[in-house]
Amino acid sequence: MALTLEALAARFGGEIVGDGRCEVGALAPLDQAGPRQLAFLANPKYLAQVETTGAGAVLIAPGDLEKLGAAAHGRNFIVTPNPYAYFARVAQMFIDLAAPPRAAGVHPSATIDPAAQVAASAVIGPHVTVEAGAVIGERAQLDANVFVGRGTRIGDDSHLYPNVAIYHGCTLGPRAIVHSGAVIGSDGFGFAPDFVGEGDARTGAWVKIPQVGGVKVGPDVEIGANTTIDRGAMADTVIDECVKIDNLVQIGHNCRIGAYTVIAGCAGIAGSTTIGKHCMIGGAVGIAGHVTLGDYVIVTAKSGVSKSLPKAGIYTSAFPAVEHGDWNRSAALVRNLDKLRDRIKALETALAAREGDAGGA
């Protein structure tokens, strides 16, 4: 389905420059777009591509349009302060238009406990299991093989993709999106040591601590594929509103993730850690337990966080990749830092002694 630029601007805002009757029915990159496709410029370094693009129209910021000057003549634009966000909203609209909603109802192979409540407008796919006391909200969509444990609540307009497992006693707010393989509400990693003796004479065991809390997920949260969020030991693990979590992320028990925070793939967050609002956690970041990150903290990829970071800012501890020979030389220096320190101290002592002798003379 194609829409005019006028229709897009009426829905999403923005100023039209050029022909508002231009129709676009899809999105494409600047260097690949055709005359019935909409492209966007979010990074000024690609400004030259706007001059050569075949796109029917381009989403562009006011400052970038000014830089184009005469090159903008004869082209169509929607001018908006944030072309990237505009693009995202248009993309979602096109997806919604192309994929008609599935008919409400429960697939014959699904297992719904009589004590569960499933909204008449919900879509329950093949082999879904919904246990007693669970509540499935209006227009929620549960795809094949989803499991919803006893007493769990799934908010209105939520979408659980195939093979998602939501354990008992959890809550997902409205418009939650949970991708395939995610597990919410599994036991936190809690074991009490009960050992006596030393060495080979040591006896005893790790005693499992029952995890009796739950997981509370706020509205408009998205959780990536194969991500795991552990239930709290006593209180709930909490994911606040509009948090976006990538694939393969581990969030330990009793954590609290503040609103609008984003967490990239393969990050690991140990238990009882609090992350503030509007934070950005890079890929493969490791965060120790029982620490607090303040609001607006950014941790770059592969960094290790071992203590609290209360102040807003950008934090890095990862070593970027270098050529192998350079790495070996750097590693050799690190291994010998204690010797270098001792040599410097000895030189400083000798120099101080010389200066003392010279002063005495």
Curated annotation (Swiss-Prot):
Q: Which reactions is this enzyme annotated as catalysing? A: a UDP-3-O-[(3R)-3-hydroxyacyl]-alpha-D-glucosamine + a (3R)-hydroxyacyl-[ACP] = a UDP-2-N,3-O-bis[(3R)-3-hydroxyacyl]-alpha-D-glucosamine + holo-[ACP] + H(+)
Q: Which GO terms describe its molecular function?
A: N-acyltransferase activity
Q: List the active-site residues.
A: H253 (proton acceptor)
What UniProt keywords apply to this chain's record, in alphabetical order? Acyltransferase, Lipid A biosynthesis, Lipid biosynthesis, Lipid metabolism, Repeat, Transferase
Gene Ontology cellular component terms for the protein in this record: membrane
Q: In which pathway does it act?
A: Bacterial outer membrane biogenesis; LPS lipid A biosynthesis
* Catalytic activity, EC: 2.3.1.191
The protein's superkingdom reads: Bacteria
Return the broad EC class. transferase
| Gene3D superfamilies per record | 1.20.5.170, Hexapeptide repeat proteins (2.160.10.10), MurE/MurF, N-terminal domain (3.40.1390.10)
Q: Name one GO biological process term.
A: lipid A biosynthetic process
Query: Quaternary structure?
Result: Homotrimer.
Q: Matching HAMAP family, A to Z?
A: LpxD (MF_00523)
Record-given protein name: UDP-3-O-acylglucosamine N-acyltransferase
Q: Which organism is it from?
A: Burkholderia pseudomallei (strain K96243)
Encoding gene per record: lpxD
